[in-house]
Amino acid sequence: MVSRFLIAEYRHLIENPSENFKISVNENNITEWDVILRGPPDTLYEGGLFKAKVAFPPEYPYAPPKLTFTSEMWHPNIYPDGRLCISILHGDNAEEQGMTWSPAQKIDTILLSVISLLNEPNPDSPANVDAAKSYRKYVYKEDLESYPMEVKKTVKKSLDECSPEDIEYFKNAASNVPPIPSDAYEDECEEMEDDTYILTYDDDEEEEDEEMDDE
């Protein structure tokens, strides 16, 4: 079953390429994906092309995938070995999974969540204690140099590790890239058990609909 879901998602992403990430699939194992995430514009991570691996469990989409950075990262919520600490991918037990993971989540939503996390760390739940301490000092203007300097090192190293083809891909895509919303990981509509959605309307739209009905 997992293969059916992944083939559909992969096909959708290939037909609708993103300016913010690039994906490739292990030819021998569709449950293993390689991704490159573009550092969000106007942030310390801008210009970086960070590599990661995504592993999908046999229970997917009823259990979350695991994302591990292979590029060196300096971030409060990324372990030194590349493992990621983000609520959207928590699913170690039924209670936790019910609170944070939904089968309706798609891989593009996950990747946008990770990109958003780069610029919006949660230092209160650190995976890298040293990075979290450095980030706090940066936020409270106690040390404005150390954290940016370490991040910029990872940006440069990520580019050194990328192929010219990958760099060219993102260079061409960066000409008109929309900003990534800070709440990209949040559902834009209410999920239902049958994977259909209830769309919400703005007040102005409701008023227009009422006027049309009166006519």
Swiss-Prot record:
GO terms for cellular component: host cell cytoplasm; host cell nucleus; virion component. Optimum temperature is 37 degrees Celsius. It is found in: Host cytoplasm; Host nucleus; Virion. Pathway: Protein modification; protein ubiquitination. Its cofactor is Mg(2+). Its main location: host cell. InterPro entries: Ub_conjugating_enzyme (IPR050113), UBQ-conjugat_E2_core (IPR000608), UBQ-conjugating_AS (IPR023313), UBQ-conjugating_enzyme/RWD (IPR016135). Its EC number is 2.3.2.23. The active site is at residue 85. Interacts with host 40S ribosomal protein RPS23. Interacts with host translation initiation factor EIF4E. Interacts with host E3 ubiquitin ligase CUL4B. Interacts with host RNF138. This is Ubiquitin-conjugating enzyme E2. It comes from African swine fever virus (strain Badajoz 1971 Vero-adapted) (Ba71V). The gene is UBC.
